[in-house]
Amino acid sequence: MGMIGYFAEIDSEKINQLLESTEKPLMDNIHDTLSGLRRLDIDKRWDFLHFGLTGTSAFDPAKNDPLSRAVLGEHSLEDGIDGFLGLTWNQELAATIDRLESLDRNELRKQFSIKRLNEMEIYPGVTFSEELEGQLFASIMLDMEKLISAYRRMLRQGNHALTVIVG
């Protein structure tokens, strides 16, 4: 099946409820807590996005990489067998947006390698042909633009971003 990822827009009340819940691991409460919230769903492409921005898998991110944090969240709330939760507080979103918007897309394109993506098994069990490299990169850039747009909306609304990756 694989793991899917999305970015949920969460208000202060809901995030505080989630963080204060100590009865069970956060992942046990995540679906109930996030039910009905607006979100950007990027399905199984979340690791493609991470790879396209950083050159590494989200399963093995470079320490203190600001582009990795733009995808995974500024703060790791839970990282385990059931999934991953990351949080970017509203006051951190402007810097995250600036970081993503300031990227040189041409430089990212030069660094992008479908051969490396296949070697790292970013999408396990699938080998992508080199003919798809441009199309795959364009898809990653589209997801990045959608993420920037979602982050802008969250910033305007005074909400926070919760990165959710579940299996």
UniProtKB/Swiss-Prot annotation:
Q: Which residues form the signal peptide?
A: none
> What's one Pfam family here?
DUF1877
Q: Which domain of life is it from?
A: Bacteria
Quaternary data: Monomer.
- Its recorded name reads Protein YfbM
What is the organism of origin for this protein? Escherichia coli (strain K12)
Give the encoding gene's name. Answer: yfbM
